[in-house]
Amino acid sequence: SDPNFLRF
């Protein structure tokens, strides 16, 4: 549920 984990 964290869009930050898609930031890679």
Swiss-Prot record:
Keywords: Amidation, Neuropeptide, Secreted. GO terms for biological process: neuropeptide signaling pathway. The modification Phenylalanine amide is found at F8. It is found in: Secreted. Nerve cords and paired groups of cells located caudally to the base of the pharynx. The keyword Thylakoid does not apply. Myoactive. Belongs to the FARP (FMRFamide related peptide) family. This is FMRFamide-like neuropeptide PF1. It comes from Panagrellus redivivus (Microworm).
